[in-house]
Regions:
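Conserved Radical SAM active-site core
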Residues: 3-10, 18, 22, 41-42, ...
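Short, charged low-complexity linear segments at domain edges
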Residues: 16-41
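Flexible, active-site-adjacent loop/turn segments at secondary-structure boundaries
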Residues: 26-29, 34-35, 61, 144, ...
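A general boundary/transition motif marking the beginning of the first structured unit of a protein
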Residues: 15-16, 185
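A short, compositionally biased domain-edge/stem linker segment
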Residues: 6-13, 29-31
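Conserved AdoMet/S-adenosylmethionine-binding subsite of the radical SAM
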Residues: 77, 96-216
């Protein structure tokens, strides 16, 4: 778990954190399709804005903040609670471009667990129960993020990405869930990953099962 330092002072500084707004691309109740929590019911909040801009990204509309509606913490918490999801996944875009303290406090005060999917390119913020780090070679994660990583999920296209995966795994805490994920439009990466995992069984495979299931 990651908790921001001096939390009480920061909360006091926010007159009413429930009224803080975030640019939101979409929010929805679905099944987590990737990673360690695949198959679990979850509520997704996709923030707008990204400084990584992966060419294979399937939500390029999330890159720019402009043009997306602003939603308050109060509104987002209400939607998440009404869905009856056991946990919320904050994703993007790159969600850590925003101060997540108000949003995560609101969600946790409602009894929800908070997960995040991030490239780690910006400093951690907020209260986070599960951190999935998906690092990119062209926008490296901050060093501070590694101490808090619960799950390392690396998108693989070529052998270079396998080397990159190992470099990042070496910085993660013992017990971190290690996953390799094929890039959806690069099927040849599947054979590469399968053989690598057979030879290195500390790694597992993450698939984008939501695309097979045809759910958001």
């Amino acid at each position: 778990m990651f908790k921001v330092e001096n939390q009480s002072e920061l909360v006091t500084a926010q007159k009413d954190f429930m009224d803080v707004v975030y640019p939101v691309v979409e929010h929805f109740y679905t099944i987590q399709g990737e990673g360690a929590h695949t198959g679990r019911a979850s509520y997704f909040i996709r923030t707008a804005g990204c400084d990584v801009n992966c060419w294979w990204c399937d939500v390029k509309e999330s890159w720019e903040e402009e043009g997306h509606p602003k939603m308050t913490v109060r509104e987002l918490v209400k939607e998440a609670v009404e869905s009856k999801a056991p946990f919320v996944v904050i994703t993007g875009g790159e969600p850590l471009l925003h101060d997540l303290l108000p949003l995560t406090l609101g969600l946790k005060s409602a009894g929800l667990q908070v997960h995040i999917e991030t490239s780690g390119s910006s400093p951690l913020s907020g209260q986070l129960d599960w951190i999935t780090l998906s690092p990119k070679r062209f926008k490296k994660p901050t060093e501070e993020v590694f101490a808090y990583v619960d799950e390392l999920k690396v998108v693989v296209l070529t052998n270079k990405d396998l080397k990159w995966a190992e470099e990042n795994a070496a910085k993660c805490p013992e017990g971190t869930k290690l996953l390799l994920q094929p890039e959806w439009e690069t099927p040849k990466s599947i054979d590469l990953i399968v053989e690598y995992v057979k030879e290195n069984p500390e790694w597992g495979i993450s698939l984008q099962t939501h695309k097979f299931l045809k759910v958001p």
